[in-house]
Structure formats: structure tokens, C-alpha cells
Amino acid sequence: MIGPSTEWPALTEYDADHLERVALPIGGIGTGTVSLGGRGDLRDWEIVNRPAKGFVPALGRYGAPFFALYARPEAGPAVLRLIEGPLGVEAYEGSHGSEVRNHGLPRFRDCRFAAAYPLGQVLLSDPEVPLEVRIEAFNPLIPADAARSGIPIAILRYVLVNPGAEPVAAAVCGSVPNFIGADGWNLGRDWRGSPDDSMGPKDNRNVFVEGDGWCGLGMSSAGIDPRAEQWGTLCLATTTTEEVTYRTAWAELSWGDSLLDFWDDLGEDGKLSEREGGDADAPVASLAARVVVPPGDSRALTFLLGWHFPNRRTWQPRAPSAECCAPGGADLDRVGNYYTTLYRDAQDVIEQVVPALGELERETVGFVRAFCDSDLPPVIKEAALYNLSTLRTQTCYRTEDGRFYGWEGCSDRQGCCFGSCTHVWNYEQATAFLFGDLSRSMREVEFGHATDERGLMSFRVQLPLERAKEYGHAAADGQMGCLIKLYRDWQLSGDDEMLRALWPAARRALSFCWIEGGWDADGDGVMEGCQHNTM
């Protein structure tokens, strides 16, 4: 049975009885994530500027994202499988059968999951399949380098292992619907009353693209307003440049026939033939790469999913004005995404990442291995490492100017409790020690923008920053904690320029304790007054 990679560390391995709730977010700081599910599926597509738990984009009843394996031994018939483990029995329950995307497609029988965040491995085998598969998925995480830890990409390597005695002709095929215009929030309903995200996209198009050492399918939209949060680009690519076939759209047929047409086409020889997609608003992009796996050997095929959604809006957008609603009008609530200033579009993400892929993986693995090899108790390693994932979820983001902000957390469909709340973020330590520049940007906002002339620091920061003091309430623990964090960040960085710039506001913030009727009005160093705090 296939095992975890010897090149990647693994802290935890989950067996078949413990996979249902496993989901490893893949994405950069401030970019959103796609999660690798415990069985190898891609779930929780949270890349469109908001949380979207449970969101798996699909074109109506078919076309949800998946990767599939074609395998034909030299002296046997071809086998087709989703590169996923089996569904649980409960997944087939529903008023009209299973609500799980792609539930009717065959899967591998045996599945395990190994992880040491941000490295996730899915281990798949089946006595009826001549190849075993290991999915190796990650997004770069490199301490002290927020830019290279903030890339909007999911890197998925499919390692095909041949335990048999004859060569196996194989192909891995990835399919992703062009769902630009949908974000998992404003869902329509199909005829059964189930959520239907195919109603958001409009006039979306896919095109085959090539670059230096890669090829793939670029996804864009001509029908979505370029100012909308849901507007952007996607790119599904592979670093394999030979034996690659693709579809820019699936055949537009009735009911399940579009899926059957695709399945039969791939199953014939592991190649795809182009189809006429008709006028589908969300055409499915499919990309297949072929390889021959010698007996007793393995081959790896790497796929990349890049994204670029620039139009993030503030925590609590105001009612749109006539000016911003007019053609070409400015959206006064738009704060943007820093990552989209580094890349022109999703295709440019792929173009920049491919030549650096080896280095990005080496540095990520080096960090994770050093941490896993430490003498900390395993439970501490797991808690500390795995909770770094919060930095890369929609809990956190960077506005177009590079500043770092965070919700208190995420609800399933929206951020929960706005404003980089000082008396919640007080208790978070990872950012300062791993990405000091991001932590210092929070201090700059707190003291440079959210603290007024009296020394009152708004413990929730409104955006854009012209509105930073609007909230107008102070929290004792948050305000005092920010003073301690300013000292900590200076100790870690030695940034005298930052400290000098923020020092006057820091003095005012401390003096605020001593105002009449304040937290420590008598100045004895013990807070007796009314104190808004999180305890």
C-alpha cells in the first residue's frame, strides 16, 4: 500500500474512519483558499473575497471540480477513477439522492491522509486499479517572506506508482467550471430547491494558453461587471508540456449526458477531444496530461490552480451612491487585494510561480521539517503548526496598499466581527514571530490611524482608513495590549523608525487610562474604572 512521501514531513496520519472532517486550506496569506478534503476532493472554494464553507462550484447538475485517473495496463482494459477516496454511507442520503458533487463517479476504495501544514498528502489505492496515487498538495509558507507566502495558487502533484510487473499508460485530468460571477453567497435554487451556483456566471470563456514550461486553460468573463467582487480570472495549468489535451468546454447536452460524453471521451485513450460548448455561461475547463509508468516505478504530474479576484470591499459597505453606480464610477467601499497588485491576472500567477516552484517547495518543506524535528511534544507541534492555516483563510486579508487586517473569525458565508478587533487579536502570536512586517502594519494602523487626539484607540478599525476612527469605542485590554505588542514588534525588528513614528500616539494611548472617569483615573497603576474587555 502506498505510503507518504519520504521527502515531506508528516505529523499526523488519518485513516478511513477519520477523513470526513479533514480539510486542508491551500492558498496564500490574504488570497483565500481552496481546501483539500480528506478523501482528496477539492472543497470550500473560498477564493472570491469571502468565506464560503461548503461551496463547490458546478454548472447545474454536472461539472463540479475533480481530478480523474485513466490507467491502462499493457495487457488489460482501461480503468477510470476519480482521484478521491470513497464517500461515506451518509453521503448518499437526500430527498433526490446524494447532494455530494460528482457522487455517481467511481472512486478509489482505500484512502488515508497525511499532513504537516501546509503540506497535505492523500494516499489512494484500489485492488481493481493498476496504479496507486499519492496527492501532494501545498501552497508556499516561508517565514519572514509574506510575499512568497501570499501567492494565490494551489499546487497539486499527482504521483502515480506502479506496483505491478507491466507498464501502465496513464493520464491525470483536471476539470474546473469557469464559475467567475459566483462566490458561494448569492446562490439560486434549482428545481429541487437545492443551491445552484450556475446562475451567477455570465458569458464566461475558457482559452488554451501556454508559457515557459507550462500550459493550461485561462478562464475569464465578458459578462460580469469588472467592478464586482466576483469578477476576476482563473487558470488551470500543468507543468507537463507533452501529451497534453484539453477541452475549453463540455458538450452542451441534456441532463447527465454532458458528463457521460466527457467520461467516455477520457476513457477511450486518456485524451480529450474538444467539444462545442454552445452558449453555456460557465463552461467547464478540462486539462489532461498523459504519461507511461514503468513497472515498479513512479511518475509525477503537477497541476496548478491560480486565481486573481481584485475587488475586495470593506467590512461593512455603505449603501452605494449614485456616483459609484454610474458607468465607470468609483466604488468608495473598495479596498482591493494586495496580491492582485503583484500579478496581472491568474495566468501571470502561473507564469511567475512555475520557474520558482522547486525553490518554493524546498523552503516550505525546510521550515516544516525543522519545526517537526523539534523536541516539542507532538500535541503542541500539531496545534501550533495547523493553526497557522488561519492566516491564509478569509479571516485575514491585505488591502491593496499591503496593510494586514483580520476579522475575529469566519462564519460559513461571511466574516464575523470586523475591524482587526484589538481585544481579540491581542491573543494571537504567530503573525509577529513569522511575518513581522504584517504585524508591524497592524501597529501602524492602530496607532497611526485608529487613535484620536485624546488617546482613545477604536478597537475596531473601519475601512477605508479615512473612516478608521468611526467606531469610536475603546477596549481596555485591547488598547493596553497594543502598547505591549508595539514594544514586542520593536524588540523583534529593531525598527527604530517605526517606534519613533508611533511614539506620540503610544503616549496618548497610555495617558488615556488617566483621564477623568477613566480606567485608572487616580493613576495608581491599578484599573478600577469601567473596562470594556473580552474576558
What do the PLM-derived regions correspond to, one by one?
Residues 1-8, 214:
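Intrinsically disordered, low-structural-confidence terminal and linker regions
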Residues 12-57, 267-284, 290, 297-304, ...:
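Substrate-binding groove/exosite segments of carbohydrate-active enzymes
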Residues 124, 135-137, 172-176, 297-309:
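Short, hydrophobic/aromatic-enriched beta-strand segments in well-ordered soluble domains
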Residues 124-130, 161-170, 292-300:
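A short, structured loop/turn motif at beta-sheet edges
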Residues 8-72, 78-85, 92-95, 106, ...:
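Internal mixed beta-strand/loop scaffold within catalytic domains of large alpha/beta enzymes
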Residues 29-101, 215-264, 269, 336-340, ...:
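Acidic-aromatic substrate-binding/catalytic surfaces of carbohydrate-active enzymes
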Residues 84-153, 251-287:
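Extended, loop-rich substrate-binding clefts of extracytoplasmic carbohydrate-active enzymes
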Residues 135, 140-265, 287, 312-314, ...:
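Polysaccharide-binding surfaces and accessory modules of carbohydrate-active proteins
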